[in-house]
Curated annotation (Swiss-Prot):
It comes from Cellvibrio japonicus (strain Ueda107). PROSITE patterns: RIBOSOMAL_L34 (PS00784). One of its GO terms (biological process) is translation. Belongs to the bacterial ribosomal protein bL34 family. Keywords: Ribonucleoprotein, Ribosomal protein. It comes from the Bacteria. This is Large ribosomal subunit protein bL34.
Length: 45
C-alpha cells in the first residue's frame, strides 16, 4: 500500500507558504492571529 505522505517542497510552499497565506482573506487572518500571538515564525515554510 502506498503511504499517504509523499513529501514535496513545492506543494508544501504553494499550500502553506507566506504568499499562499497572503493570497486569501482567511490566510491573512491566519497571519494576523500569529502576529498578535507573537509567533517568531509566521509560516513554517
Amino acid at each position: 500500500m502506498k503511504r499517504t505522505f509523499q513529501p514535496s517542497n513545492i506543494k508544501r510552499v504553494r499550500n502553506h507558504g507566506f504568499r499562499a497565506r497572503m493570497a486569501t482573506k482567511n490566510g491573512r487572518l491566519v497571519l494576523a492571529r500569529r502576529r498578535a500571538k507573537g509567533r517568531k515564525q509566521l509560516t513554517r515554510v
